[in-house]
Design a protein with these regions (language model features):
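Nucleic-acid endonuclease domains
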Residues: 1-105, 120-196
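Conserved catalytic cores of phosphodiester-cleaving nucleases, focusing on short active-site segments
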Residues: 109, 114-120
């Protein structure tokens, strides 16, 4: 079950919680899979980093793959908390209207009445070209992202708004926690967004 009710989100607090994740290496250990997803779905109900760490320990400390499960659950928690906060950032803007059905898998919000599924992603190493090429050829990157992401539960070909993060040192994932910075970028983008 995924909860998307972020009525009173304190972005500063969420940013602090997300940055606690930086203390551990960010590695998945495996491709996202439904079995480990179901075992770690509790991450959707816990906003506090220390609480999620404690729950992971309680659930998996005797499991032979404890470290892998820990990394997997922490990464899912981190990505979920960041995605919900970024969605909240979009919804704060006057040009955006939130969806009425929080369980809608194909859209997160509307911009000028056009539905979008928001996806925050790190710059994909599998794209095969550098970030400068992607900036000059955004349609090619968007096409690659459509084809190569969300192969599991959320695949669809509806409108998506990709927020792609890149950091020169390769630590792209850390940018998902920089919510105050992301808010400036999103507001700048939406302020210049024009109805088609």
């Amino acid at each position: 079950m995924i909860f998307r009710s972020f009525a009173a989100v304190n972005l500063e607090l969420v940013e602090i919680q997300l940055k606690k994740r930086w203390a551990s290496e960010y590695k998945w250990g495996r491709k996202q899979a439904d079995i480990w997803d179901s075992q770690t779905n509790f991450i959707y109900t816990i906003a506090d980093f220390d609480e999620v760490v404690a729950r992971i320990y309680t659930e998996f400390n005797t499991h032979r793959k404890y470290e892998d499960l820990r990394n997997y659950a922490l990464n899912r928690w981190y990505n979920f908390q960041s995605a919900m906060a970024v969605e909240h950032i979009f919804n704060l803007h006057s040009k955006v209207r939130r969806v009425k059905n929080d369980k809608d898998r194909e859209k997160d919000f509307y911009i000028y009445g056009v539905a979008f599924d928001h996806k925050t992603s790190v710059f994909p190493s599998g794209f095969g070209k550098d970030v400068d090429y992607a900036v000059d050829n955004p349609r090619e990157l968007a096409k690659w992202l459509y084809v190569n992401q969300s192969e599991q539960q959320r695949f669809h070909a509806k409108n998506r708004l990709f927020l792609v993060l890149h950091k020169k040192d390769g630590q792209h994932w850390k940018l998902k926690a920089e919510l105050s910075w992301i808010k400036v970028l999103v507001d700048t983008y939406l302020d210049s967004y024009r109805e088609l």
